[in-house]
UniProtKB/Swiss-Prot annotation:
Keywords assigned: Membrane, Transmembrane, Transmembrane helix
Name assigned to this protein: Maintenance of telomere capping protein 7
Transmembrane domains' residue ranges: 13-33, 42-62
Its membrane topology: Multi-pass membrane protein
GO cellular component annotations of the record: membrane
Source taxonomy: Eukaryota, Fungi, Dikarya, Ascomycota, Saccharomycotina
Top-level taxon of origin: Eukaryota
Record region (Disordered): 94-121
Coiled coil region boundaries: none
Positions with biased composition (Basic residues): 104-114
Location within or outside the cell: Membrane
Function: May be involved in telomere capping.
Record's keyword annotation contains Transmembrane: yes
Length: 139
């Protein structure tokens, strides 16, 4: 018996088709027509989803790529372009705008309720009074 050589099955191309806007629009309006015959509320829902879809495309491909066009020219693939345009400029500007601060010195806490002997005598005479915040008022 001869062993038959198995040819590798090609990958399904549906994931490529879903990435095309024309194919998405065909599916979108087909599902819209199908479901609006069942329930008219779906018409409003699908139009809302379509507006959100257009807004996402606008912000990802136009706004983000416009602000970092120099990064986009260096990319090969679309996914890498989106990653570089969306994350790297924000990360680099964040690190430049807020550099690591040097460690701050801890302030010594003052003990409340203890006065030096000279201050006690002056307070007894009425020369020094304390307001509600604990600040000294000289009269």
């Amino acid at each position: 018996m001869k062993k038959e050589k198995k040819t590798p099955t090609p990958l399904p191309s549906h994931h490529v088709l879903f990435a095309e806007p024309g194919f998405f629009l065909c599916n979108f309006f087909f599902v819209l027509l199908k479901h609006t015959q069942i329930n008219p509320f779906f018409y409003f829902l699908f139009i809302l989803l379509f507006i959100i879809y257009i807004a996402i495309i606008y912000f990802v491909f136009i706004r983000i790529s416009h602000f970092s066009f120099s990064l986009c020219r260096q990319c090969n693939s679309l996914g890498r372009m989106i990653f570089m345009c969306a994350y790297l400029p924000a990360a680099s500007s964040r690190s430049v705008a807020n550099p690591a601060l040097p460690p701050q010195k801890k302030k010594k806490k003052k003990k409340k309720g203890t006065l030096r002997t000279g201050e006690v005598e002056e307070q007894a005479k009425g020369n020094i009074s304390f307001d509600l915040c604990g600040k000294q008022n000289f009269q």
